[in-house]
Amino acid sequence: MAATPEFGSLRSDDDHWDIVSSVGYTALLVAGWRALHAVGPQPLVRDEYAKYFITASRDPYLMNLLANPGTSLNETAFPRLYGVQTRFFDDFFSSAGDTGIRQAVIVAAGLDSRAYRLKWPNGATVFEIDLPKVLEFKARVLAEQGAIPNAGRSEVAADLRADWPRALKAAGFDPQRSSAWSVEGLLPYLTNDAQSALFTRIGELCAPGSRIAVGALGSRLDRKQLAALEATHPGVNISGDVDFSALTYEPKTDSAQWLAAHGWAVEPVRNTLELQTSYGMTPPDVDVQMDSFMHSQYITATR
């Protein structure tokens, strides 16, 4: 049996990717799970654009998943988990808009389509930060579908390890006005120092009244954990050949504690199971077991 790769073994300080390689492929995988959730029973959200990204990628594994969607509680676990996550961030931006915030920043936007899916208030602008190749792929696919955003949309092609605040401001972001920020699915792919730098830079760009939502994990499902979960819950592992441990870094400073110590008023932290309950769902055993590995945290805070 091959040895389990060390955390971050497929990463380097200056690595880059497109949508079908390295970290970029995880965005495609999550889009596939959102597409599956949209056609599943009682979806929390319907991302009607997600399926088009899979088709455009021509990835055989994901195309097969969409052509033959599983229906059991085990087979729909990952799509359900990401349905919960998507709903959380959707609600966050809707709530921020209700408070008068008109600048939304999606950090490491990947294949997020909220600028197109959500109803945004008049005058709202959605800033999407990600690597150029990821943004180019998304723009091409959405243009092919004739998609029109429901808010002003500004692409910020930048590496989060570089001077992305300069690029954000050049794209029209005004740090003197309040803003709402999402950090969704990103933190496992950052080192502890990079995570602290990200939060520091966000804080420096936030006027009073700004808000942030963070999805964090206390740990990640590595291949051994997925294999163990698959043994007790057949069909749950629909992540293909992705080895998350080799793409991500070890657990780091607690995000809620960091924010609270740096000027943010942090609301009570919830996990996936608590969110499911708040959405009127009863978490099945497979979801409970999955979260016992991942220790999910959903955080909201105000500046």
Curated annotation (Swiss-Prot):
Protein's organism: Mycobacterium leprae (strain TN)
EC number: 2.1.1.-
Entry similarity comment: Belongs to the UPF0677 family.
Entry superkingdom: Bacteria
An example molecular function term from Gene Ontology annotations: methyltransferase activity
GO biological process assignments: methylation
Listed name of the protein: Putative S-adenosyl-L-methionine-dependent methyltransferase ML2020
Residues that bind S-adenosyl-L-methionine: 130, 159-160
Pfam families named among the record's database cross-references: LCM (PF04072)
InterPro entries, per the entry: Ppm1/Ppm2/Tcmp, SAM-dependent_MTases_sf, SAM_mthyl_Trfase_ML2640-like
Signal peptide interval: none
Alphabetical UniProt keywords: Methyltransferase, S-adenosyl-L-methionine, Transferase
Biological role stated in the UniProt entry: Exhibits S-adenosyl-L-methionine-dependent methyltransferase activity.
